[in-house]
């Protein structure tokens, strides 16, 4: 079976290679990152251009309430029709950086201060998002999510998070590593799989039980 290789840049700036069987295309690719400092924490989602419009049309219907620039990039604030939630999204050259608020749209100065506290570098392979020096924020978690048509999805955590996810017992061998079956919390009879490779790990959800052969051909590798 032919393989397809994804060369990605994570929110932290780390480089990730994911090798997948080439029989089905990747249908979506997104990332997430969370920052915290003291009692404060905030999370962001990163998707391709059009991510904001898709979310506000199909996920949680919302209308734009404000637009302004932060460090030369446009930020769009949208409020859900029921006013129970709102989103603010920074539009990059290749990607969009979104955060979600509870309740009505926040004031523009609050949103501007949040995005202004970040150093953002947008590459074709991914958006790098880091707290600016002096903010006292640190990156606590990051992940990259990949969906493959008719096969399933992978969630790849950052290397530091991955260490805590590896079971202590040996798993079943795959081409590049080993795999463990894990019961999905709160979903009787539903399972995910932890795929461990020499330089990375992924949580895999299969579209059907016949996807085990597909899973066995996946490799995940973070690079220094």
Model features per residue range: what roles?
Residues 1-224:
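Intrinsically disordered, low-complexity prosegments and terminal tails associated
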């Amino acid at each position: 079976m032919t393989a397809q290789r994804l060369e990605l840049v994570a929110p932290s700036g780390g480089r990730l290679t994911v090798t997948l069987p080439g029989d089905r295309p990747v249908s979506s690719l997104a990332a997430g990152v969370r920052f915290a400092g003291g009692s404060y924490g905030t999370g962001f989602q990163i998707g391709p251009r059009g991510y904001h419009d898709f979310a506000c049309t199909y996920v949680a219907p919302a209308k734009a309430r404000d637009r302004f620039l932060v460090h030369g990039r446009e930020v769009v604030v949208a409020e859900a029709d029921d006013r129970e939630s709102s989103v603010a999204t920074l539009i990059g050259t290749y990607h969009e950086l979104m955060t979600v608020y509870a309740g009505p749209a926040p004031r523009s100065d609050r949103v501007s201060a949040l995005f202004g506290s970040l150093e953002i570098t947008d590459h074709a392979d991914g958006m790098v998002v880091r707290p600016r020096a002096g903010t006292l924020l640190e990156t606590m978690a990051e992940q990259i999510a990949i969906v493959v048509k008719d096969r399933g999805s992978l969630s790849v955590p950052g290397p530091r998070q991955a260490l805590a996810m590896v079971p202590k017992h040996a798993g079943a061998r795959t081409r590049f590593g080993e795999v463990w079956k894990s019961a999905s919390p709160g979903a009787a009879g539903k399972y995910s799989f932890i795929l461990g490779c020499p330089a990375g790990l992924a949580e895999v959800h299969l579209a059907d039980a016949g996807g085990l052969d597909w899973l066995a051909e996946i490799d995940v590798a973070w690079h220094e």
